[in-house]
Amino acid sequence: MNLNDDDDNYNSAIVIDNGSYLCKAGFGGEESPRAIFRSVVGRPNFCTRGVKNGMGQKDCYVGDEAIVKKSILSLKCPNESKSPVNWDDIEKILHHVFYNELRVTIDKGVLLSEIPLNPKENRERITQIMFETFDTPNFYLANQSVLSLYSKGRLNGIVLDSGNNITYTVPIYEGHSIPNSINQLEIAGNSVTEYLMKILNENRGYNFTTSSEKEIVKDIKEKFGFISLNYNNDLYSTKVATNEIEKSYQLPDGQMITIGKERFICGEVLFEPSLVNIESYGVHQLLYNSIINCDFEIRRGLYNNIILSGGTTMLPDFNDRIKNELINLSPSSMKIKVVENNTNENNSHLAWIGGSIFSSLSTFEQQSISKQEYMEYGSKIIQRKCF
């Protein structure tokens, strides 16, 4: 039963893509998520714990409400890659999705996305939470990159998925990822933002240091950042020398700041991790390595079906840079195709859209785990039914 009487989506599965920065949630069969909010939980910090609940203080805040009150809260992102999963906070985010954002009772099943190479113990724990804490009648856990591929109507291809914390390259054949050929790099959108902070401070004499200022720099990146198609040439180009690429940005206090070559220098960390002292291949090389680690017979289909997913891949010219780099790395006989998005399609929503499509299929209930199966086999059933 849906608590919104005027809503006709109560027959649809609930679809949740809980990323490291944003959580997207909605109903299967719809074109876009109903709710998008920050994947963050805030609790009163030491200085404010003594404030009584009668004065309006809650034990915790989730999502955008936590961001608004961040000055008096200690914020945690439960999906951050470098930290152990905080299951209590995961439960709070899911509770917020069901009862505050979507306002539903859970009687039609849930599809939840997961990261590639998600550890078995994490998969079993979230399965336990869904059945024992939220009492869902059906549950399905799906690789976020596979869902992104589904959003393009494909079962075969390779997904370069770059969100806030990690970039993955995931080859997929007949709707299943190929685990031994998946690569990952702990450089993504957050790394680009932090590098932009660093070079603006060093090159322009600014002093961006706080978390609030980091959000400002993130906004600068999203408004003015782009990927260079020829980094060394652009770095010493006439446009840079004559300040033609400079843009002005107004800070919240009204001060105007200027950004020039930093607009494309920041994104180069994705292709040259050594800029931030990380010894690793760039995202283009990881993509190529994932392809050549697959059987020869399926490589052509991977080269010809490259999907870019995650907000970081929305930086202008990212698509063309990836294509150019792969052309340089690959045999000349191979056709390289990066699948274009439809007008107004948001790369950061692809996993959710794929989940919406998959959960609306007539076979979804049969493919998902039922409450009866969970009661009979326990949480390990996830390893057999969702792979």
From Swiss-Prot:
The keyword Nucleotide-binding appears for this protein: yes
Entry superkingdom: Eukaryota
UniProt-listed Enzyme Commission number(s): 3.6.4.-
Reactions the enzyme catalyzes: ATP + H2O = ADP + phosphate + H(+)
UniProt xrefs under Pfam families: Actin
Stated role: Actins are highly conserved proteins that are involved in various types of cell motility and are ubiquitously expressed in all eukaryotic cells. Multiple isoforms are involved in various cellular functions such as cytoskeleton structure, cell mobility, chromosome movement and muscle contraction.
Name this protein carries in UniProt: Putative actin-29
